[in-house]
Swiss-Prot record:
Listed InterPro entries: Aminoacid_DH-like_N_sf, NAD(P)-bd_dom_sf, THF_DH/CycHdrlase, THF_DH/CycHdrlase_cat_dom, THF_DH/CycHdrlase_CS, THF_DH/CycHdrlase_NAD-bd_dom
UniProt subunit comment: Homodimer.
Keyword Metal-binding: no
Catalytic activities: (6R)-5,10-methylene-5,6,7,8-tetrahydrofolate + NADP(+) = (6R)-5,10-methenyltetrahydrofolate + NADPH; (6R)-5,10-methenyltetrahydrofolate + H2O = (6R)-10-formyltetrahydrofolate + H(+)
Organism per entry: Helicobacter pylori (strain J99 / ATCC 700824)
Its job: Catalyzes the oxidation of 5,10-methylenetetrahydrofolate to 5,10-methenyltetrahydrofolate and then the hydrolysis of 5,10-methenyltetrahydrofolate to 10-formyltetrahydrofolate.
MF-aspect GO terms: methenyltetrahydrofolate cyclohydrolase activity; methylenetetrahydrofolate dehydrogenase (NADP+) activity
Keyword Oxidoreductase: yes
EC number, UniProt record: 1.5.1.5, 3.5.4.9
Positions with a binding annotation for NADP(+): 169-171, 194, 235
Alphabetical UniProt keywords: Amino-acid biosynthesis, Histidine biosynthesis, Hydrolase, Methionine biosynthesis, Multifunctional enzyme, NADP, One-carbon metabolism, Oxidoreductase, Purine biosynthesis
PANTHER family (alphabetical): C-1-TETRAHYDROFOLATE SYNTHASE, CYTOPLASMIC, C-1-TETRAHYDROFOLATE SYNTHASE, CYTOPLASMIC-RELATED
Name this polypeptide is given: Bifunctional protein FolD
Gene Ontology CC annotation, any one: cytosol
Amino acid sequence: MPNRGVVLLDGQALAYNIEKDLKNKIQIITAQTHKRPKLAVILVGKDPASITYVNMKIKACQRVGMDFDLKTLKENITEAELLSLIKDYNTDQNISGILVQLPLPRSIDTKMILEAIDPNKDVDGFHPLNIGKLCTQKESFLPATPMGVMRLLEHYHIEIKGKDVAIIGASNIIGKPLSMLMLNAGASVSVCHILTKDISFYTKNADIVCVGVGKPDLIKASMLKKGAVVVDIGINHLNDGRIVGDVDFINAQKIAGFITPVPKGVGPMTIVSLLENTLIAFEKQQRKGF
């Protein structure tokens, strides 16, 4: 029997409400300035998952009235060509934010590409300058997924200060920035990765468990503390057509106090956080007369 007291962290519903607010703000801004925020999206290659994610972001832009410029590039594009495009976007006053859909082909140096983006247009929050500001608690663009996770927890009034948090996955995109946000919020944070000997040691003692590594059913119910907050950031496409996370959701909800579903949990919050960052970038650029 499912835990009747478990609360589903409904990212889709929250994202919908945030989108409504964004749409209203953009309408007001457009009426006042006759300008709209504009997101530049760069897609390299034909990876099915990347195409799906880009389409979701474009549709979200359309829903809130945000302009976008999509560049779909062949997989054999050179680094020099890609850098040239980013340079053009950096200097284009009509572009508020720049997003390079990851992963890039192996032939391209992802780190170099991300570092080429103007930090003031880095709405994904991946530029070293923005990551450094995050670590030192200075105002910066936060990576969209960690930002969405924190917003979701805040919405459900989940206390972070003084809590033990286990983060499974140490990527630059999710695990590392999320650990800094949790630390900045007053949590004691343990980050587990591929070399961690016993993940369950950390998860069993954690008040909040966040996982995003791309392995279905990695986190079992037996690995959780009763009443824990479980944030499933994983997205896995199974052969039978189902989309699942990294947590054994059916059994974990019998133990957890709060849990995100997959889909409709963290995913929608990631996209709406990207839109929020783009609007923030636009407003900053307008204040500077850019």
